[in-house]
Amino acid sequence: MADSSFDVVSKVDRQEVDNALNQAAKELSTRFDFRGTDTTIAWKGEEAIEIVSSTEERVKAAVDVFKEKLVRRDISMKAFDAGDPQASGKTYKVSGTLKQGISSEDAKKITKLIRDEGPKGVKAQIQGDEIRVSSKKRDDLQAVIALLKGADLDVALQFVNYR
């Protein structure tokens, strides 16, 4: 019997983030407490989002609205990293980035967790910004998925190419 395997990745569906951003922008334009504050939310490059408002409280509230929209679209909060509000002239800005890929140190933590706490006979290999987990038994792979879902890691994980 051939080995079964799956890949552990950390990727965010950009279209879902774009939908959440558009929903947040629409809500910010119609909400009463944001009237007259010139609050905007927009893409800044490929992986960055910028939120601008007239006061620090409004920019923090706009970040909360955006995070709420991300959660409703099943995007993990671990995938979005928002900075602190910064004053620039008469406005306040928050720049946030989307985290894509598993860093080498996080990959090492995950493979160590699989080796230490996972079932015997499961192999985890780091392949760039993803991890390939393989085993002879599919039940062992399902146990590893449950282990990783239950672990408190700093990165949002998805499981793809399950074969």
Curated annotation (Swiss-Prot):
InterPro entries: DUF520, UPF0234-like_C, UPF0234_N, YajQ-like_sf. Belongs to the YajQ family. Gene3D superfamilies: 3.30.70.860, YajQ-like, domain 2. It comes from the Bacteria. GO terms for cellular component: cytosol. One of its GO terms (molecular function) is nucleotide binding. Keywords: Nucleotide-binding. Nucleotide-binding protein. This is Nucleotide-binding protein Mvan_0997.
